[in-house]
Amino acid sequence: MAHEVDLESFKELERDIILRVLYRDQTVQSTEEERVRKLKSHLQHLRWKGAKSSSQEYKEKCCARCQRALGLLLNRGAVCQGCSHRVCSECRVFLRRTRAWKCTVCFEDRNVKIKTGEWFFEERARKFPTAGRRETAGAKLLQSYQRLSKISVVPPTPPPFSESQCSSSSRLQELGHFRGFNKSVENLFLSVTTQMRKLSKSQNDMTSEKHLLAMDPRQCVGHTERRSQSDTAVNVTSRKASTPDILKAFHQEDPKHPPDPVLKQDTPPSSPTHSAVFSGGLRHGSLISINSTCTEMGNFDNANVTGEIEFAIHYCVKSCSLEICIKTCKNLAYGEEKKRKCNPYVKTYLLPDRSSQGKRKTRVQKNTLDPTFEETLKYQVDPGQLMTRRLQVSVWHLGTLARRVFLGEVILPLAMWDFKDSTAQNARWYPLRAKAEKYEENIPQNNGELAVRAKLVLPAGPRKPQEAQEGQLALNGQLCLVVLGAKNLPVRSDGTLNSFVKGCLTLPNQQKLRVKSPVLKKQACPQWKHSFVFNGVSSSQLRQSTLELTVWDQAIFGMNDRLLGEARLGSKGGAAGCPDSGSQSKLQWHRVLSSPNLWTDMTLVLH
């Protein structure tokens, strides 16, 4: 909307100052126009100098600039790449820091465009043919002041931001009368913001996780599913269609992140006491692949699940390595029923970690329903984490154009596995099952580990006898907590996280002290090394208090942050749904309070 500006409303001194500035601007513009005119006249002079006159006689071969005769063998001249004229060696100008050259006219024409800024207007005219010439506010004021005292000034329009396509098109029609560079910028900003909102909704739908179930017909299973946080729900068909676009937008630059310290590819050699099942196996790790990322997002085909798979499990305490020997499969379904074709391979995960670092897979066996792999897949995992992990062994078909087809899976809770039993290391046959939408609620979920250091700082002694009598010494305590880092977190599909830590100390009077660490972006194993300090607490208060630490993944485009895991210390220790961790957290909290002014290192399991 235009605003009316009346110069007569200003005082005489103010009006003189405004006009003086405008006239000075007009003087600068006239000086600039004179400089541009001289540059163009010099360029025109060079062109006239090289033009041939009808009153003079020229040889057949001569320089197009200085009209000097050119020889047949020596001083033959060369053709300019800009104007395609043959010029002599003296009429060439070499460009700075390059071996390329131009003739004097082409070089001067290039300089004129650079010094006058014509290259910008040429590029703008080429990209935006309908854009008009830019007019400055000073020129408009001077022209209108000479005619009328009232001036109409149009302020710059803020960038539009609308939800629906209809409102976006109407906004573009309102901006149609504006000319110049502002129109192109606003159109570009509108398209970018609209696309970003669509991309954020689709990407957030892709990150919804589906927890899988251990296939045991004698056990009762629960139902828990993490819902998407977008405004509208999408079906499986639209999810499959939007996945390649999202991967193309978010994986143009391959993120560089350190390998997972819990799950490593390079493991020490296994113990010689292994059974013969593991002696002949080959270790085969997997790399980051977009196709595996798509399968975790649900972008795959399903076949009629049939058949069985034979594998064995062994854990080496000395090297802290879990070994899965994939033997063979039988009676698999066809990955491509029409072509009667099946190219199977096996892929494993240690749930809940579905990242690319936690993936292991075998080689692909071509054209067989009864493949034999004889490969050993290894994980580097601590013994304390085995009770909270589930082994997922799935069989896939590699189709045309790297299309994956799901052939079946087996999920085994490692908490129920007896690694000390020698008979448990023998290879067993397991029936393949279809993908389930549920998971067992009675199995504690391990979402990684959080390394912290804690210290209770208490004064050495009271400075005055009155302080000890009044109890001021007990209230001057300080709880210091250093969040070192985390590992084995449930990362995104690209293998990275934008993680941060929140801390909440709940005192006996229900007062809550909250702190937060900075965000570390694009790191799978973040190392914050950030200090949390809680002042004005006593040892007696902390014995009845609870410290809760939560790790979060910062969302993009203003969506809700994703909770990665939590750990509790104190009188009400233990994460929700994991009662076994309560006694351990209370013991660690007691160690901190019983050793004041000393650092205590702890590794907290996130649930």
Curated annotation (Swiss-Prot):
The organism named in the record is Mus musculus (Mouse)
Biased-composition ranges, Basic and acidic residues, are 248-259
Annotated protein name in UniProt: Synaptotagmin-like protein 3
InterPro entries (alphabetical): C2_dom, C2_domain_sf, FYVE_2, Rab_BD, SYTL1-5_C2B, Znf_FYVE_PHD, Znf_RING/FYVE/PHD
Q: How does it sit in the membrane?
A: Peripheral membrane protein
Q: Name one GO biological process term.
A: intracellular protein transport
Q: How does it assemble?
A: Monomer. Binds NRXN1. Binds RAB27A that has been activated by GTP-binding via its N-terminus.
The main location class comes to membrane
PROSITE patterns, per the entry: C2, RABBD
